[in-house]
Swiss-Prot record:
An essential GTPase which binds GTP, GDP and possibly (p)ppGpp with moderate affinity, with high nucleotide exchange rates and a fairly low GTP hydrolysis rate. Plays a role in control of the cell cycle, stress response, ribosome biogenesis and in those bacteria that undergo differentiation, in morphogenesis control. It comes from Mycobacterium marinum (strain ATCC BAA-535 / M). Belongs to the TRAFAC class OBG-HflX-like GTPase superfamily. OBG GTPase family. GTP binds at residues 166-173, 191-195, 212-215, 292-295, 321-323. Its cofactor is Mg(2+). It is an enzyme of class 3 (hydrolase). This is GTPase Obg. Pfam families: DUF1967, GTP1_OBG, MMR_HSR1. Residues 160-340 form the OBG-type G domain. HAMAP family: GTPase_Obg (MF_01454). PANTHER family: DEVELOPMENTALLY REGULATED GTP-BINDING PROTEIN-RELATED, MITOCHONDRIAL RIBOSOME-ASSOCIATED GTPASE 2. Residues 438-479 are annotated as: Disordered. GO terms for cellular component: cytoplasm.
Amino acid sequence: MPRFVDRVVIHTRAGSGGNGCASVHREKFKPLGGPDGGNGGRGGSVVFVVDPQVHTLLDFHFRPHVTAASGKQGMGSNRDGAAGADLEVKVPDGTVVLDDNGRLLADLVGAGTRFEAAAGGRGGLGNAALASRARKAPGFALLGEPGQARDLTLELKTVADVGLVGFPSAGKSSLVSVISAAKPKIADYPFTTLVPNLGVVAAGGHSFIVADVPGLIPGASQGRGLGLDFLRHIERCAVLVHVVDCATAEPGRDPISDIDALEAELAAYQPTLQGDAVLDDLAERPRAVVLNKIDVPEARELAEFVEDELAQRGWPVFLVSTVTRENLQPLIFGLWQMVSEYNAARPQAAPRRPVIRPVPVDDSGFDVQADGHGGFVVTGARPERWIGQTNFDNDEAVGYLADRLARLGVEEELLRLGAKPGCAVTIGEMTFDWEPQTPAGGHVAMSGRGTDVRLERSDRVGAAERKAARRQRRERDDD
């Protein structure tokens, strides 16, 4: 069973909005109480929240489907439905959210950072909210909107200050175990480390985090070995450290060629966070070299031989031994100095400014195109949303939809493009036979929908009518 998972595909679905209610107020001695249907509740959203206590994406490996609660239906007596609760999904610090096209949506760093992965649907309006001067007693309500659903890829990129890279069995895990309290698995065979290991290193009154990445081999950036799966964990590192095995007996291996091979893999790797204003490219990150295993006499001689050549590249070089713990303190304080200098020099993340994108004045909000088969296709956020809100089992609701489309200008545009009565018109997932509201076209005034003739005329005699009747009787008596 996998215990460390750093990449998963999850299926998020927000809650749908509750349907509105169509009801009439009923009370003794009030025969014309009017509409009192409440609105539906908003659907719950799926929200990712960074939790420092979570360190892996293992939970999503077994439960990849995440669904929020839907809103409740509205009720009579102007009672709105309850809103669905937002579903907060805990993710590790350093999680990157990608859409199904690989586009970066969010980089979640820092405890409490939130990202709305799927937005809940809006609740439908009840007939009380739909009532107006022209439509006093609506006999229908709007349906709730479906919640947003999309597939997302979560990648965990370890939040560490120093990343240790090197060939398998170079001593990276051993180095982490002696400079921190981490206890990674250590053995004398390649690819012992299968998952990244983190260790907190104390440098005087300061501390920094070191990440041990599984060993790299030539071709790791193209997917060979384990490198492609774990190179993402060094994207956030301020300092990259080459850990070189100076005691290796493999033919064709030496410290210079090992470092050149690793640099070629780092240059070929395309990080997801490339182009971030705060993080430099991997090629521009400061480097350090650790020549390991100098407790072996031949390894010490080789390390001293190549030390000057590596120093000419401008990289600090440390000769260490994890067995005798030689030169570990200079290494720790040297790495802390490099981390602090890099963090002080790089620009701080600017706060995100709200961007307001007003709708253009000449934007009608929809578009009508011929489908090539004698029909037409209407696209646009509002018409498609209105289709989803309409209960097509209610004739009055269908008429209300027709009025909304006519006010938006859809009917006039269809007439302008030569639409004939009975032609097929598609809006969203609904296709219907179009019939103009009036034979004269779209410029004729529409009659109001949802009117109640009982509210227009009444047989009840008011005070003014009684006063006029008494005046007429007095005039007749005088005559």
